[in-house]
A protein has these predicted regions:
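Short, non-transmembrane alpha-helical segments in secretory-pathway proteins
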Residues: 2-35
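Low-complexity, intrinsically disordered/propeptide-like segments
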Residues: 31-34, 100, 109
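Short, acidic, Ser/Thr-enriched surface-loop or helix-capping motifs
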Residues: 73-74
Length: 118
């Protein structure tokens, strides 16, 4: 049986967390580049990043119309459709740590969330 030190274990967790953070930033960039009608941001929760969208007005400034687009699990990188403001729907739609799933997510992503339906 292989043994790991606490530092090695912590380093692996940190590496995975940094990778998930990087992919979430790429996800936001993809969403923001696909529309001028919304601006997308992430909010930190206890377990999930909440991906929110704000409607952009005709003057190009953010309005006060805010909604949840999706959730990303901070520990696993799984992407979920929003069931409401505070909770994701059951069943992950994409896995940001899996290259094929991530590419499919980014290719199909849109501001309306249609790609998140099963």
């Amino acid at each position: 049986m292989e043994t790991f030190s606490i530092k090695e274990h912590f380093d692996k967790i940190t590496e995975k967390t940094n990778l998930i953070d990087k992919f979430v930033e790429e996800y936001l960039e993809v969403l923001n580049n696909k529309t001028n009608d919304y601006n997308f941001y992430k909010r930190h929760g206890k377990r999930f990043y909440k991906i929110t969208q704000i409607v952009v007005g005709r003057d190009g400034k953010n309005t006060d119309q805010l909604s949840v687009h999706s959730f990303v699990d901070m520990n696993t990188g799984l992407v979920y459709k929003a069931a409401g403001w505070n909770a994701p729907a059951k069943g992950a739609r994409f896995d940001l740590l899996d290259e094929a799933s991530r590419k499919r997510c980014f290719a199909n992503a849109d501001s309306y969330g249609g790609y998140l339906y099963r």
